[in-house]
Amino acid sequence: MNGLGIDKVQLTFPSDAVRLRGGFNHCDGWSPKVKYMESEELGSYPVQRDYYSDVKLGTGNLTMVLENETLAPRLSTIFNPTTCFHEFALTTDMKKVRDVMQDVIYKAGIDVDILEGKCKRIDVTKDRILSEKADNYVPALASFLSFKRQSTKLEYDNGCTLGNQSKQLGFYNRYAKLEKDGLLKNAIFHENTARLEYRLLSKGKRTWTDTYNLHTFNDVVTASMDQFNGIFVDGLKNVGLRDKLKGDELDINAIRPMSLISTMQQYETAFGRNWFQTYLKHQGIVSLVEQYSLDTLVIALAEVGGGKQSKVERSRIKATLNDAIKLNTRLTQGRSSLDYIHEFYEQFKQAV
């Protein structure tokens, strides 16, 4: 399933934008665990209260943190536009998302205009069906584009991340994640579906809110699908493939030198501390065969060093050379990392 959408939104509301309805804290979803402070004037008063939507679908899986409710309430909200309507299908219909989330927040006892919320985090996301499962692309992304394998969160076992505390790209096997969550029982979903998330994080909001004109949720609601796609592609190019492009095309010369390292790493894994001697031997055999042919090399080896060899000995030499050639081919001529990176880039830069 190919798709483009906003998969996470974090908003903050200042005190003058938050109005608490009477008895709000008795609405479903508010945690009974509340943080309090003490003062001589006020006694014990709440300083932080947390909210978790009791159902996921139809509520955006909303979580909220309400601070300083007694004196000057401040509100932070996080929700997933996808789950306003569906368990996993991405959406860019932020006007409908606005209506759903405005209602959910109101039913939690808080009266705010969601359009006034200041953007703190936005995840612009694409799902693409690749030619292989997403796991197979991870080594190339990790080796050549400096993506890092993500191991601290189970949902990203089959993926990797790239970026900093301001902007990140997260790539993972979407099919594996949904299957793990039990969401594919009654759904048709291609097993090669991969997800790439462009995460605009809170520490970089002073920069990206200006760059992409996403200051408030109203800016998100009024943005078009083309704008979201432009933001996503900008992240793909400038975070994921920075210094690896010439214009809109991959710069082969910026990636190709890494192919030699990848090949040598394959030999090191296969042969341990003797990998380099084996690598040189195999490369030499392949080079001689390409220059003279296998039969000519067998004849030459049979004639040198011990006189003429029997047909049996020649067959043994030929078999040994063939084994070396086949192993070299397997270790060096599988699908290249460059090919994986090229498909990754071409697929995710496409408009949906």
What is each of the regions a protein language model found here?
Residues 319-326:
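Residue-level detection of the helix-turn-helix DNA-binding "recognition helix"
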Residues 309-319:
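Helix-turn-helix DNA-binding segment
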Residues 1-306, 327-352:
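Structured, helix-rich domain cores that form ligand/interaction pockets
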